[in-house]
């Protein structure tokens, strides 16, 4: 059976502890099909139970797997009731296009769960800020100050230095033979790489409290991903108290913010002693705060909440995506040999991988780091594929299901890892993987693939003690990001020398 993980423990505890307490408030949920209140044509969905709604349909599988199976029975636009939260699940290209393009303004905001209220300081970050003037202000700062092409390119040397440091560490592991041979745990190594790159871009140097900070990032992901009572029954204060989830979220936020406080204080002291701030992201935010003139002045908690976003997005998703890419290559030796040969042929003259030689690479169809895209919320009543979506409905796009839909991925099983799908002459060669084609909604590509390509260029890889790599365990873990359940320990074999080693 697929991983049910600790997230479902919350469901079990909730069923036991809340059923009696909330029984007096029990209402029979209206069937999420046909016509609802006011003659609305609501999307179809599975039958519900009092209090828990549709939760019993999700237990025993990973949520994105269970939702894909339910959508096969009820359709690509499906209404669930997760606890007391009405949730629209979108599982087709056409439905995703209507939601994210045709009615993008209606779905432009995100819901804030009890845990997210705590972690984001009541939605003061760019990712979860409610749609409105404050969000537009943050987006303008991101587009015109933080993420300009010039600024991103200015950090190229940081990326290259950190990738080189990782390659040297892997080369050292490859030197051992026999009993002395060492392995590399890929997700940990790649996540650490992404964290170090992010830290240097944000602060100007590596975060000396990296391990503690990463632990808080991991804890945050666990807290926001689980089916916990505070988020399932937001109208019940008792649910939050019973679960203790809000208290744990506060502890996680406070620990992470204390680390950021120390770093920010160092940057402020450096700016005072040097007479000018640097060009790192923290300096930019502090400069904007000092200059003022904003409609909504930036408080220090606003700055810390947005830095927390940058680290969460910059390290967790990159490490997860690259670990899956390596696992798929290991499990498909023919594809691995072809990819390695092409990479070495492309960069042979240079002797190393550089960003100049990279195109955008569609790698994340089977394993999008966010299998259920970050939730949105319907701001105003609208219709999707002919169904009415009431205001306040939470919306989830099942990107994992879109990437495995046989209607969009002909030429073999959609579960098959076959990069040739994107080559010229293939039916799917013209698919745009930057978000224009809604059957494929990956979470990135481009520069972040540089570390993975460098690992193929310099090393061959093998799974210690495994004669048949096609048997590699590919089970996913429960969480907001779809990590591998098992660590990926690989043995590197040096094939192209690493500069500086």
Task: Kindly label every feature range from the protein language model.
Residues 89-99, 106-108, 204-213, 315-341, ...:
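Classical protein tyrosine phosphatase
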Residues 61-69, 293-305, 402-451, 461, ...:
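Cytochrome P450 heme-binding Cys-pocket and its upstream "meander" loop
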Residues 2-17, 43, 163, 190, ...:
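Cytochrome P450 proximal C-terminal region
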Residues 35-58, 63-154, 158, 190-197, ...:
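Cytochrome P450 substrate-recognition site 1
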Residues 1-33, 196:
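Terminal signal-anchor or tail-anchor transmembrane helices
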Residues 39-43, 57-60, 128-131, 147-156, ...:
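Conserved, non-catalytic sequence blocks in retroelement Pol enzymes and Pol-derived host proteins
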Residues 37-47, 51, 156-160, 213-221, ...:
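Cytochrome P450 I-helix active-site segment
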């Amino acid at each position: 059976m697929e991983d049910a993980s600790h997230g479902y423990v919350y469901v079990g505890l909730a069923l036991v502890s809340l059923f009696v307490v909330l029984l007096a408030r029990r209402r029979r949920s209206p069937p999420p099909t046909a016509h609802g209140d006011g003659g609305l044509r609501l999307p179809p969905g599975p039958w519900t139970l009092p209090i828990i709604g549709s939760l019993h349909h999700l237990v025993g599988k990973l949520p994105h797997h269970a939702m894909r199976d339910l959508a096969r029975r009820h359709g690509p636009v499906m209404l669930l009731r997760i606890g007391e939260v009405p949730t629209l699940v979108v599982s087709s290209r056409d439905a995703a296009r209507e939601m994210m393009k045709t009615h993008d303004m209606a779905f432009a905001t995100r819901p804030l769960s009890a845990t997210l209220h705590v972690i984001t300081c009541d939605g003061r970050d760019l990712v979860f800020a409610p749609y409105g003037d404050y969000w537009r202000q943050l987006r303008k700062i991101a587009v015109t100050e933080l993420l300009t092409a010039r600024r991103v390119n200015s950090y190229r040397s940081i990326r290259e230095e950190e990738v080189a440091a990782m390659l040297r560490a892997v080369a050292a592991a490859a030197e051992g033979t026999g009993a002395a041979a060492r392995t590399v745990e890929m997700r940990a190594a790649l996540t650490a790489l992404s964290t170090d790159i992010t830290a240097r871009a944000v602060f100007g140097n590596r975060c000396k409290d990296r391990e503690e900070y990463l632990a808080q990032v991991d804890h945050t992901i666990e807290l926001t991903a689980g089916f916990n009572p505070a988020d399932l029954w937001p109208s019940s204060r008792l649910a939050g108290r019973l679960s203790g989830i809000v208290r744990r979220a506060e502890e996680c936020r406070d620990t992470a913010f204390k680390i950021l406080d120390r770093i920010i204080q160092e940057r402020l002291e450096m700016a005072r002693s040097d007479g000018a701030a640097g060009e790192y992201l923290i300096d930019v935010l502090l400069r904007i705060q000092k200059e003022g003139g904003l409609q909504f002045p930036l408080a220090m908690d606003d700055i810390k909440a947005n830095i927390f976003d940058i680290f969460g997005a910059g390290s967790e998703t990159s490490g997860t995506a690259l670990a899956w890419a390596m696992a798929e290559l290991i499990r498909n030796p023919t594809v691995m040999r072809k990819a390695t040969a092409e990479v070495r042929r492309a960069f042979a003259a240079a002797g190393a991988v550089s960003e100049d030689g990279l195109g955008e690479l569609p790698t994340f169809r089977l394993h999008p780091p966010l299998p259920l895209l970050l939730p949105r919320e319907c701001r105003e009543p609208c219709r999707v594929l002919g169904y009415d979506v009431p205001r306040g409905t939470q919306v989830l796009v099942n990107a994992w299901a879109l990437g495995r839909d046989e209607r969009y991925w002909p030429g073999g099983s959609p579960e098959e890892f076959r990069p040739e799908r994107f080559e010229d002459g293939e039916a799917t060669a013209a698919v745009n993987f930057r978000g224009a084609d809604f059957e494929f909604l990956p979470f990135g590509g481009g520069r972040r693939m540089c570390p993975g390509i460098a690992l193929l260029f310099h090393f061959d890889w093998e799974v210690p003690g495994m004669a048949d790599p096609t048997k590699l365990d590919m089970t996913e873990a429960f969480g907001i990001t779809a990590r591998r359940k098992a660590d990926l320990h690989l043995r590197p074999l040096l094939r192209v020398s690493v500069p500086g080693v």
